[in-house]
Amino acid sequence: MRYKGSVYRPPSEAYSLIVQVTYWCSHNTCAFCSMYKEKHFAIRPLEEVLEDFRIARGVYRRVDRVFLADGDALVRKANELYTILDTIRELFPECERVTSYASPASIRIRTEEELRTLRDKGLTMVYMGLESGCDDVLKRMRKGHMSAEIVEMGRKVRRCGMALSVTAITGLGGPELLERHAIETAEAFNAMNPEYIGMLTLMVEPETPLYDWVRDGSFQLLTQPQVLEETRLLMEHLDSPGSVFRMNHASNYLVLKGTLNRDKEAMLRTIDAAEHDLSRLRPEEWRGL
């Protein structure tokens, strides 16, 4: 496929056909994020997008999944998204799922009728970053949205019958906001009740404001015991029946997998075991993004 710059995808889209629908991220100011820094956000010409799908049809015998990249595909005009989804359905009748990243801003500009039409045309799920349910964390990290707005946009997606996968980042509040970050993030997840909850653990990337803050001492990273403390607080306060919980990203020290609320106690026991034996944690040198 023809790609411009670095292309990022959720771990679950490893075997998907990935086509860039936009270039880079429409927000691109989060203090912790090093992605999509090559150039400014741009809408990819529609004919180029459609041509990529035609090329893929000639190359791949079967395409079960499609991921619409880059960081905010949903920001395109609705009729162009319809055309893209119609083309996918026409060229790949075997395709079972189409997904994309979405920001609170791009969800806000879509009417519920448009979201339902996107769902009916095959957009089965969107990935949205919550990062934290604590407004003080979101402000410092320059997310551009407060928790209530992110929650409302997540609920909007759910109302329209589309699946929702939401991620947050352990350690994003530092030691100072550890408790609020954990509890308020859990409360935000509970309010959205998404199909999927994904937790990453903060990693500091060069050429980000967060990197500079860590170097000058204005931001403190959590220790491994503090990461476990925060994770336990989050899990204790999660009440999102049916949500699939995944904390298995390469950035995480501890792997947790289960379905809420059914597996909550088992995951708490796993955290407790790790707190008593830190050798259960992923070594620092094995972590990655």
Where are these regions (language model features)?
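Conserved SAM/AdoMet-binding glycine-rich loop
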Residues: 57-160, 239-240
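Aromatic/hydrophobic pocket-lining residues that form the small-molecule binding cavity
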Residues: 49, 81, 111, 150-151, ...
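Hydrophobic faces of well-ordered beta-strands that scaffold small-molecule active sites
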Residues: 17-19, 64-66, 96-100, 126-128, ...
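Canonical Radical SAM [4Fe-4S] cluster-binding loop centered on the CxxxCxxC motif
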Residues: 5-48
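Conserved strand-turn element in the central/C-terminal portion of the radical SAM core barrel
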Residues: 105, 133-137, 157-181, 200-206, ...
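Conserved, mostly hydrophobic/aromatic
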Residues: 25, 33, 49, 68, ...
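Catalytic cores of alpha/beta
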Residues: 110-115, 173-191
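Auxiliary Fe-S-binding modules of radical SAM enzymes
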Residues: 1-13, 187-289
